[in-house]
């Protein structure tokens, strides 16, 4: 008995049989395919973040369920995209129990919550690696990545780029 393998995954459809002494083209001896229309779905298949059950007889993994209803899931969406229902906007949801926290929201800075799931410090708005001096950091202007303690400071530009508090127009330090 031979079983048709429409999706070419090496697992045959138990409902597509053929009796033959030799193996017909497109048929195999295995009859364990649970979805012969998808080559990513077969017994013990690796689970993909695609919104579909890939492992035959299993259930949708928890990281592919949108528990908070924000249209984001925890896993990183597979390269083939999201195929399940409901439609999902993206993956990498860092808090799947709070709809206000996901990669699609605008970050609210300085509240101590990584609202956009970027993984960075909530106290480093300009992304220069230095937290704001208003939040125990050393960055005196957290809206400009070129301004932080230790940055090179160009004289006479009116900007305290290195956060030392010195007069930008007094290079020789004589007070004038």
Where are these regions (language model features)?
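Membrane-associated feature with strongest affinity for ZDHHC
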Residues: 1-176
């Amino acid at each position: 008995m031979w079983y048709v393998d429409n999706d070419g995954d090496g697992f045959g459809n138990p409902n597509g049989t053929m009796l033959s002494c030799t193996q017909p083209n497109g048929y195999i001896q295995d009859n364990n395919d649970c979805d012969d229309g998808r080559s990513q779905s077969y017994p013990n298949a690796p689970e993909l973040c695609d919104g579909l059950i890939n492992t035959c007889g299993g259930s949708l993994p928890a990281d592919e369920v949108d528990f908070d209803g924000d249209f984001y899931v925890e896993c990183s969406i597979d390269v083939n995209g999201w195929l399940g229902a409901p439609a999902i906007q993206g993956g990498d949801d860092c808090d799947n129990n709070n709809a206000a926290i996901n990669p699609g929201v605008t970050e609210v800075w300085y509240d101590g919550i990584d609202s956009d799931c970027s993984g960075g410090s909530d106290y480093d708005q300009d992304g220069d690696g230095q937290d704001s001096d208003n939040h125990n950091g050393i960055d005196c202007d957290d809206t400009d990545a070129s301004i932080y303690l230790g940055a090179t400071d160009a004289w006479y530009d009116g900007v305290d780029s290195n956060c030392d508090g010195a007069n930008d127009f007094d290079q020789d330090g004589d007070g004038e």
